[in-house]
Amino acid sequence: MILSRLKEHRERRGLTQMELAKLSDVGRATIAAIEAGKRPRPHPATRWRLARALKVKPEELA
């Protein structure tokens, strides 16, 4: 699930949700909702922006 992978990659890079939000241009509330499982299937463009900010392939967050 993206929620566990997103948090794992974010923490591995030592980023807070706010820092990732700034790097990815995705709202912090959206990131929090994804990580909490409230948005388990984010839009592909959102996943792409998060992956780019985390320097991973989008498939790694799928």
Can you describe what each PLM-predicted range is?
Residues 10, 21, 51:
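The alpha-helix within a helix-turn-helix
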Residues 39-40:
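Gly/Pro-rich interdomain helix-loop hinge
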Residues 14-33:
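Short alpha-helical DNA-recognition segment
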Residues 25, 43-60:
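DNA major-groove recognition helix of helix-turn-helix/homeodomain DNA-binding modules
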Residues 36:
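Short, conserved catalytic or interaction motifs in soluble domains
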Residues 7, 18, 48:
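Residues within the helices of the helix-turn-helix
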Residues 1-12, 59:
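A short, Lys/Arg-rich alpha-helix, primarily the initiator
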